């Protein structure tokens, strides 16, 4: 009897211990799914010991490269593992991750838009990542260090740095172009910035007031004046640019007694040719000595001898440089997967252990390889060579899938009426079910008989549209060009448009918090189109019906990058488009019809109309109203700056849920966007900043306002994890 009791006691202890261990080690299911998606995107590499495509417990089973705190993954170190593939699209579910290091691999594709929202250190250096910095970066308010150096990032830097507390950022050795965005000027904690070896242009004035201790902007195309504040930066590299220096420019007093801790310079340039044009070299010493006179003949012989000697050394230097370049190029060709350059990250360790996460270890940036990377020469495509046969030589988009006409006929049930979602200015839109079970949307664009040049133009539009990747833009999945058919395949977001949600009684009222979230999402998408491409992409048809709301009520703009296809459509489609344009008169800017009118400034105007629509609950154009009230902007423009009139024009469903100060600031933003003269409308990047400031003010008021307790979206803004939290799906149905 006593033995049985002892056995029961031991069994109880054993069971309790097992349950305790399981409770301690079971990893968050969302984080497990994120790692499984990453493993699949990395092509199931054998070197990731312990990783699985299904099941498993990363924390309990000690998957390679993973460190946990309890059941949360806090550290993901996959450095120098010769990994291939991409980073997937589920990293945003790693909510507790602090450190992400995937440097020194062979990763390809773009940087995911969804990054770990609470990460403090991200290192993706020495890979083959393309595109540019994702527009979700401002959501990472805890980020302290970002290293994206030695990749293939290209295009302009988006205006994506607002609200960050980052201290160290390295974007060097890429192919970034364009001017520095204004949001650089908001990085008031930034102490180390490395931008060398890109093709950045314009002024560096946004860096003037930053507390920088390390700044390297060498080998770019920066121009304009050099901020005087730069001479107080202890470690500074600015050579190889096009700065303008006046003839009477006062020489700087560089801190020569401080040696660089990092980077690839060992001192000041040894020749004037490597410094910026006309920029004074620092004088280390000034020594004056009396010299004896030299006769004219001696002077002639001396000058001639020096000239001959200089010519000899110049020829020798050219020969040696040519041979050195050939050797380095050969090394680069034979080791294409390795980036030969000196480190651009600091040589210091990052202290990232915190009270909340004591198990996080320090990580140190990679050591320096010994050779310097030589960029490959640009490849030029001779367009005349592909005019011989469009179908045989056309280069289709590499970011989208090529579907056959038979596949899409099967997916849409031969484009049946039951799958017809609607008619737009570019043709009919159908719902489709792809062979893998995924739902999609197929847009059938009837074209007139296209010339070879017009077919090439269509393909160029596809190339651009297929590259668009933004959380507030509907993604192009694929296309079909076959037997005269031109079909585009988009992801299926849902069939709820902002227009339906705003103006159909079954969906009203949308909460004020949700309306703000929609406004900032649409503005960010437009900013992405305008700031991340050269030339900028204008939507040219922004309206409530073109903004879809997904299951989480996140706004997604449709038909981005397709504006230039309208002249290529058939006459019947053009007629239908003109009828639709009459219905959308309220979004059309005053300069419409003038040369160059369909640009980014027209998008700014349409954004202002949308903001006004969200505030008032009225349609942009409503023929059922009295003549003086049909055009929303015309009716509201005189009321926006009168406090009593402004209060009266606010939608009754949200009246009283926010302060008059917030309403007044929102009205100011609308007024800026809807200026009659396009020159006075600000760029959308400034509208994003203004809306962000407005939401921050709303947050402060919501925390102490009783009225806002009825608005779950306003409360969601107060989260410390991310600036915007996905909204509950029931709120827009609230009665």
Swiss-Prot record:
It is a single-pass membrane protein. Residues 415-695 form the Protein kinase domain. Expressed in seedlings, roots, stems, leaves, flowers and siliques. Residues 319-735 are cytoplasmic. Residues 24-297 are extracellular. Keywords: Glycoprotein, Leucine-rich repeat, Membrane, Receptor, Repeat, Signal, Transmembrane, Transmembrane helix. Glycans are attached at residues 118, 128, 147, 175, 189, 264. Its main location: membrane. GO terms for cellular component: membrane. The chain crosses the membrane at residues 298-318. PROSITE patterns: LRR (PS51450), PROTEIN_KINASE_DOM (PS50011), PROTEIN_KINASE_ST (PS00108). It comes from the Eukaryota. Disulfide bonds: none annotated. LRR repeats lie at residues 78-94, 96-119, 120-140, 142-163, 165-187, 189-211, 212-232, 233-253. Pfam families: LRR_1, LRRNT_2, Pkinase. Disruption phenotype: No visible phenotype. One of its GO terms (molecular function) is protein kinase activity. Residues 358-378 are annotated as: Disordered. It is found in: Membrane. Residues 1-23 form the signal peptide. The protein kinase domain is predicted to be catalytically inactive. Cannot functionally replace STRUBBELIG. Belongs to the protein kinase superfamily. Ser/Thr protein kinase family. This is Protein STRUBBELIG-RECEPTOR FAMILY 2. The gene is SRF2.
């Amino acid at each position: 009897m006593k033995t049985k009791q002892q056995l029961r006691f031991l069994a109880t202890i054993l069971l309790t211990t097992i349950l305790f261990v399981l409770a301690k080690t079971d990893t968050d299911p969302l984080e497990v799914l994120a790692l499984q998606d990453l493993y699949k995107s990395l092509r199931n590499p054998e070197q990731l010991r312990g990783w699985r495509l299904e099941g498993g417990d990363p924390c309990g089973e000690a998957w390679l490269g993973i460190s946990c705190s309890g059941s949360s993954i806090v550290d993901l170190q996959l450095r120098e593992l010769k990994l291939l593939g991409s980073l997937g699209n589920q990293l945003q579910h790693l909510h507790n991750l602090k450190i992400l290091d995937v440097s020194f691999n062979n990763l390809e594709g773009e940087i995911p838009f969804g990054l770990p929202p609470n990460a403090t250190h991200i290192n993706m250096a020495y890979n083959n990542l393309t595109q540019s910095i994702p527009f979700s970066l401002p959501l990472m308010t805890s980020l302290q260090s970002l290293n994206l150096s030695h990749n293939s990032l290209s295009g302009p830097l988006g205006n994506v740095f607002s609200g960050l507390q980052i201290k160290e950022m390295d974007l060097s050795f890429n192919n970034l172009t364009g001017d520095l965005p204004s949001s650089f000027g908001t990085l008031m904690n930034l102490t180390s910035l490395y931008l060398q070896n890109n093709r950045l242009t314009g002024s560096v004035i946004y860096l003037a007031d930053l507390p920088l201790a390390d700044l390297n902007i060498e080998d770019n195309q920066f121009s304009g004046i050099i901020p005087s504040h730069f001479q107080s930066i202890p470690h500074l590299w600015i050579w190889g640019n096009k700065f303008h220096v006046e003839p009477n420019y006062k020489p700087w007093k560089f801190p020569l007694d401080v040696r660089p801790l990092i980077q690839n310079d060992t001192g000041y340039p040894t020749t004037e040719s490597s410094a910026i044009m006309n920029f004074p070299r620092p004088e280390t010493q000034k020594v004056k000595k009396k010299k004896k006179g030299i006769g004219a003949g001696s002077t002639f012989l001396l000058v001639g001898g020096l000239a001959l000697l200089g010519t000899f050394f110049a020829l020798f230097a050219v020969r040696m440089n040519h041979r050195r370049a050939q050797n380095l190029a050969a090394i680069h060709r034979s080791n294409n997967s390795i980036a030969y350059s000196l480190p651009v990250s600091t040589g210091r360790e990052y202290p990232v252990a915190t009270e909340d996460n004591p198990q996080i270890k320090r990580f140190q940036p990679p050591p320096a390889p010994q050779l310097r990377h030589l960029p490959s020469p640009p490849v030029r495509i001779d367009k005349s060579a592909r005019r011989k046969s469009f179908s045989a030589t056309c280069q289709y988009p590499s970011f989208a899938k090529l579907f056959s006409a038979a596949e899409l006929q099967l997916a849409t049930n031969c484009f049946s009426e039951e799958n017809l979602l609607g008619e737009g200015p570019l043709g009919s839109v159908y719902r489709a079910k792809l062979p893998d079970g995924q739902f999609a949307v197929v847009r059938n664009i009837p074209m007139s008989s296209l010339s070879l040049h017009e077919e090439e133009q269509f393909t160029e539009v596809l190339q651009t549209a297929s590259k668009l990747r933004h959380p507030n833009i509907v993604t192009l999945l694929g296309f079909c060009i076959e037997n005269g058919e031109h079909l585009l395949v988009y992801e299926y977001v849902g069939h709820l448009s902002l227009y339906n949600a705003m103006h159909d009684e079954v969906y009203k009222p949308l909460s004020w918090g949700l309306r703000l979230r929609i406004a900032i999402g649409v503005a960010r998408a437009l900013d992405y189109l305008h700031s991340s491409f050269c030339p900028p992409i204008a939507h040219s048809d922004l309206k409530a019906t073109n903004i879809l709301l997904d299951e989480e009520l996140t706004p997604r703009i449709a038909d981005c990058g397709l504006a230039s296809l309208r002249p290529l459509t058939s006459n019947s489609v053009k007629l239908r488009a003109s009828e639709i344009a009459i219905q959308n008169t309220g979004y059309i800017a005053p300069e419409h019809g003038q040369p160059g009118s369909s640009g980014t400034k027209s998008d700014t105007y349409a954004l202002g109309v949308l903001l006004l629509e969200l505030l008032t609950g009225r349609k942009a154009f409503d023929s059922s109203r009295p003549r003086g009230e049909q055009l929303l902007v015309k009716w509201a423009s005189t009321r926006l700056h009168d406090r009593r009139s402004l209060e009266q024009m606010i939608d009754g469903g949200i009246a009283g849920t926010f302060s008059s100060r917030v309403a007044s600031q929102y009205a100011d933003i609308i007024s800026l966007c809807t200026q009659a003269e396009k020159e006075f409308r600000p760029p959308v990047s400034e509208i994003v900043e203004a809306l962000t400031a407005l939401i921050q003010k709303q947050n402060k008021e919501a925390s102490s306002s009783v009225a806002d307790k009825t608005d779950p979206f306003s409360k969601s803004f107060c989260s410390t994890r991310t600036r915007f939290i996905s909204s509950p799906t029931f709120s827009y149905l609230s009665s």
